[in-house]
Amino acid sequence: MTISPPEREANGKIVVDRDPVKTSFERWGKPGHFSRSLAKGPNTTTWIWNLHADAHDFDSHTNDLEDISRKVFSAHFGQLAVIFIWLSGMYFHGARFSNYEAWLSDPTHIKPSAQVVWPIVGQEILNGDVGGGFQGVQITSGFFQLWRASGIVNEQQLYTTAIGGLIAAGLMFFAGWFHYHKAAPKLEWFQNAESMMNHHLAGLLGLGSLSWAGHQIHVSLPVNQLLDAGVDPKEIPLPHEFVMNRELMAQLYPSFAKGLAPFFTLNWGEYSDFLTFRGGLNPVTGGLWLTDTVHHHVAIAVLFIVAGHMYRTNWGIGHSMKEILEAHKGPFTGEGHKGLYEILTTSWHAQLGLNLALMGSLSIIVAHHMYAMPPYPYLATDYGTQLSLFTHHMWIGGFCIVGGAAHAAIFMVRDYDPTNNYNNLLDRVIRHRDAIISHLNWVCIFLGFHSFGLYIHNDTMSALGRPQDMFSDTAIQLQPVFAQFVQNRNYLAPGFSAPNALASSSAVWGGDVVAVGGKVAMMPIQLGTSDFLVHHIHAFTIHVTVLILLKGVLFARSSRLIPDKANLGFRFPCDGPGRGGTCQVSAWDHVFLGLFWMYNCLSIVIFHFSWKMQSDVWGSVTAQGVSHITGGNFAQSANTINGWLRDFLWAQASQVIQSYGSALSAYGLMFLGAHFVWAFSLMFLFSGRGYWQELIESIVWAHNKLKVAPAIQPRALSITQGRAVGVAHYLLGGIATTWAFFLARIIAVG
């Protein structure tokens, strides 16, 4: 940390431009108003594609970084407004169309539903019996469990929150307009990294966590304590009574009677009745102990509020981002991070690339924690919701990571300045990119042949009737010894590092089965040869995805094939006429290919999760022991490709294929329709532009014959447009097919 003399740095002030851009509905009503060429209107059908491609590409509207920054800032408010409207809609459905109050009274037998289908052409068949005398569509979003954890006990509270969401959305829309049209920040404000870090760390994350912890302590904890004890939700006092009435709280948590005295006398242990460190799961609800999660949020708040005082602003004390980055150099790293500060304050694509990669990774981490340490009451035994949340957070993470590579490549093409990056780490990485990519390529080939080869060996031995020669837990074992070591170490860890904890962080590591209402919430997950095999497929597909995306970024500006690639832009079909073999080399095309491998990769991950949980974790608990949904068949079947096809895909597709005539029939139709959407994508991916142009010209000729020729000339999609439409339908079709397959299966058997 450095303390600077007062004269060294000018104090930052918040400076805005007043009324910089006129509010004009007339201008907004004109399609393509942001571009001179688009504003002229359409001559050919390509116009509508360019309109969509460029509407949010603010770089193409202007070169003025200040105006681009303001547009991005304003758009963020619009994004938040849409999120608030969506959230409000969720809460409104909970209030108006759901069985939330019934579910709250008996969460182990009644299933969550917040959607009732109208009886038009027989669609009321979709309203299944979810228990408690309610007919509706079973939902798997986890909102009911979240609401219970928040301390919501009736529909009135959901209505109120829904209205609050709409008010928040209105405020966001207003802020977005106000900060672009009325008081727009100057560029310096957007580039003041230290202030931004302090405010986001201390304000957003620190005070955000603290206020949530406050809500949990004063509302969630007492409400959940009473619900767990079997008190009727209608008898539970209203939230403000817990907040106002200390005696009421002291009945549940005796330390409340002492007020703030223990805090100021440093006897913080007094508060251990509601700030706990138990570990494991609450045996009543199958969720994390809420007193543990409150403790976690208080701790997070303290950490981030401290972190939010770390950077030097107007007080001449603290860290400077630029100084930290420029001091970051070692004996083998040349100029180190010199020049990165300038990149991160002038290229929003560089910022976005980093943030997407990190947020995507975080989403994948969340997916894994949500099942291993279920944070909300009765979430763990709602298998459909558990499967949906895992799948959802994996897909979101995958898309964010690919988006990170996309914006990193856009940064390389549009914003990278070689003169400011001489011999720093970025320059050095780009200069030895051949070594990086060729080594990564070797790793991909090694992983691909070896992981796939193990399966091929097993399929061959299985077909020849030689089970004793297969890699399996009962023949030639390939145990994941390192993973088993990590599991065991985490299981034993509390004994060494947290002796007062009742259990380890997750039941996954070892210990007893946690059962709620006769269903397994979580239990130790045994890893064996089948897991070892599929984990190496995961390693292979992850590395190939990274290879494609990283090659796209590192070769975005130039390559041996096309030395002047930077001049062609982020997306281009080929390097002009007369240069064969230069198509599909743009940075955009690498993102396009990366999306397919991301899809491959995550499909195998969610299939592994779905089958492993049904085989080894989820099931019912009786006096005789645990009976799993698929009876532990993962270890025997998942070590051959045939086993995956026969005992997972085919065996578990029976529910969706046979769903017609039942409340799950919508999933059967979606399964069919999404397959169709997926197949439709192939028409775009395997086609040539000239073929369609010829066909279009025939059709236009016929229209001319009939004197009904269109004024806007029809054009075949460009190569890039066709690939974009293709990959969009490929992913949409694939994801919706998987969705229907998973939900029909797990709702039927779970």
From Swiss-Prot:
Residues binding [4Fe-4S] cluster: C574, C583
Cell inner membrane listed as a keyword: no
UniProt subcellular location: Plastid, Chloroplast thylakoid membrane
Signal peptide start and end residues: none
An annotated GO BP: photosynthesis
Catalysis: reaction(s): reduced [plastocyanin] + hnu + oxidized [2Fe-2S]-[ferredoxin] = oxidized [plastocyanin] + reduced [2Fe-2S]-[ferredoxin]
InterPro entries: PSI_PsaA (IPR006243), PSI_PsaA/B (IPR001280), PSI_PsaA/B_CS (IPR020586), PSI_PsaA/B_sf (IPR036408)
Cofactor note: P700 is a chlorophyll a/chlorophyll a' dimer, A0 is one or more chlorophyll a, A1 is one or both phylloquinones and FX is a shared 4Fe-4S iron-sulfur center.
Chain sites annotated for binding chlorophyll a: M683, Y691
EC number: 1.97.1.12
Protein name: Photosystem I P700 chlorophyll a apoprotein A1
